[in-house]
C-alpha cells in the first residue's frame, strides 16, 4: 500500500468515526425540550467524494479540491421510516445548494445521499438558493419552498445589492424535482412556508413581507395569504397574523420556521425572532399556536424565546444565531426540532407534542412592560410558597 493509499484509508476511517458517533441528550434541560451534546451535521459530515479527488495522479497531495463551509437551515420530513433533512450546504465559494441527509433515529448517524439535489432553474436563474421548508401537502406532493437570491440589477454599482423571492418546487421522491414559477408577491420574500392543508379550497402560505433583502422595513411580521393555483402562485393580499413588537425578541423581524404541526388543541408554530444588540442581530426561536378553525387566529403565544444559542453554538460564521426551518412529529407524539447555530452547523432538540402544547398554553405571554413581568414572577413565588407549605 502506498503512502497515498494509507492517507486515504486513514481519512475514511476518521470520517466514518464522525458519521457513526452516538449522540446523547444534555443532562440538564428546561423541561420543555432536550438538546443533544453533538451537532448532527457539520461541513465535515459531507461525503469525501464531494471534496476530494481520489486519483493519485491528479491529486498526489490528497488536497480538498472542493471545500465545504457549513451545513445549516435544513428542511425536515419523515420518509419511508427514516428522518430526512434537506440540508442547506454552503461551499467555500459561498454558494449554497441542497442535499438530503438521512438518519435511522433522528438524532445521530446522519448520512448524505450520494449526490446533491439538482434543482431546476426558474426562467431567471438564481445566484444562490437556500433555506428550504418542506411540506407534505394534502394534494399528494412534497413541496419545497426556498429563497432564491439574485443581484439587484437596479443597483448596478452595488455588488452587495440583492433581491429575495420565494421559489417553489415539488417532488414525489425527493430526487426528481419539478420547479414551479417563483411566488409572485407585492414585496421581497425570504421566509415563506406552505401550510399542509387546503384552506377554503386554496393553497395557504405563511409569508414575511419586507422592503429590502435584509431589512423588513414596513413589513409587520409573519403574514398569511391564499393562492388559487400553486403552479402559477401569486399573492395579491396578505394579512399579518404574528406581529413584531418594540422591545421584544422579535423587534427587528420575525419569520415562520417549518410548517405548523396539527394537534387537537390547535396548530403549533415554530418561528424565529430577531432583535438588535451591541454585537449585531440576535436570532432566537419562539412558538405560538393558532386555531384549528381559523389558522389566522393566534390562540397562544408564550412570552420570550423557546431556544437560544448556548456555549459553542454562539460561535460560527454569523454569531449569536439559531435558526430552524424543519421539524418532525412522530406518530407517538415525539417532536424533533432541527436547528442551525451561527449559520455553521445543524443540531437537534427533542420534545413532545403534549409538552409543547403545555408550554404554549400555560407560559405567561409578554405584556410588553417590566412591571407586568415582575408581577408574574411575584405571583409564581406566592403560588410556590403556598404549594410548598402544604
Predicted regions and their residues:
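Well-ordered alpha/beta subsegment
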Residues: 328-333
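Short, surface-exposed ligand- or partner-binding patches at beta-edge/loop junctions that are enriched
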Residues: 336
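Short glycine-rich, acidic/polar surface loops and turns
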Residues: 310-314, 322-327
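Beta-rich carbohydrate-recognition and catalytic domains
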Residues: 1-73, 77-127, 136-193, 197-252, ...
Amino acid at each position: 500500500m502506498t503512502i497515498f493509499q494509507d492517507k486515504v484509508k486513514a481519512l475514511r476511517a476518521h470520517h466514518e468515526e464522525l458519521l457513526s458517533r452516538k449522540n446523547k441528550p444534555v443532562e440538564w434541560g428546561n423541561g420543555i425540550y432536550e438538546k443533544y451534546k453533538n451537532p448532527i451535521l457539520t461541513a465535515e459530515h459531507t461525503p469525501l467524494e464531494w471534496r476530494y479527488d481520489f486519483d493519485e495522479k491528479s491529486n498526489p497531495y490528497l488536497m480538498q479540491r472542493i471545500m465545504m463551509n457549513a451545513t445549516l437551515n435544513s428542511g425536515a420530513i419523515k420518509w419511508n421510516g427514516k428522518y430526512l433533512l434537506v440540508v442547506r450546504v454552503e461551499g467555500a465559494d459561498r454558494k449554497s445548494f441542497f442535499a438530503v441527509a438521512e438518519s435511522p433515529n433522528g438524532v445521530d448517524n446522519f448520512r448524505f445521499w450520494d449526490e446533491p439535489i439538482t434543482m431546476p432553474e426558474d426562467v431567471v436563474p438564481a445566484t444562490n438558493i437556500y433555506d428550504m421548508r418542506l411540506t407534505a401537502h394534502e394534494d399528494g406532493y412534497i413541496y419545497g419552498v426556498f429563497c432564491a437570491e439574485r443581484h439587484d440589477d437596479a443597483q448596478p454599482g452595488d455588488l452587495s445589492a440583492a433581491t429575495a423571492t420565494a421559489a417553489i418546487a415539488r417532488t414525489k421522491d425527493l430526487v426528481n424535482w419539478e420547479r414551479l414559477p417563483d411566488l409572485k408577491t407585492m414585496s421581497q420574500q425570504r421566509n415563506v412556508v406552505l401550510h399542509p392543508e387546503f384552506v377554503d379550497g386554496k393553497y395557504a402560505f405563511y409569508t414575511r413581507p419586507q422592503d429590502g433583502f435584509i431589512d423588513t422595513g414596513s413589513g409587520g411580521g409573519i403574514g398569511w395569504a391564499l393562492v388559487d393555483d400553486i403552479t402559477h402562485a401569486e399573492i395579491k393580499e396578505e394579512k399579518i397574523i404574528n406581529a413584531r413588537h418594540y422591545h421584544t425578541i422579535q423587534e427587528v423581524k420575525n419569520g415562520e420556521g417549518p410548517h405548523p404541526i396539527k394537534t387537537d388543541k390547535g396548530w403549533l408554530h415554530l418561528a424565529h425572532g430577531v432583535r438588535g444588540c451591541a454585537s449585531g442581530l440576535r436570532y432566537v426561536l419562539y412558538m405560538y399556536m393558532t386555531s384549528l378553525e381559523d389558522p389566522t387566529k393566534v390562540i397562544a403565544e408564550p412570552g420570550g424565546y423557546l431556544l437560544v444559542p448556548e456555549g459553542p453554538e454562539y460561535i460560527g460564521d454569523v454569531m449569536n444565531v439559531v435558526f430552524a426551518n424543519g421539524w418532525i412529529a412522530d406518530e407517538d407524539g415525539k417532536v424533533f426540532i432541527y436547528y442551525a447555530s451561527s449559520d455553521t452547523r445543524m443540531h437537534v432538540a427533542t420534545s413532545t407534542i403534549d409538552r409543547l402544547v403545555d408550554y404554549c398554553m400555560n407560559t405567561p405571554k409578554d405584556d410588553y412592560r417590566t412591571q407586568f413581568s415582575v408581577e408574574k414572577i411575584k405571583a409564581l413565588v406566592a403560588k410556590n410558597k403556598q404549594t410548598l407549605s402544604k
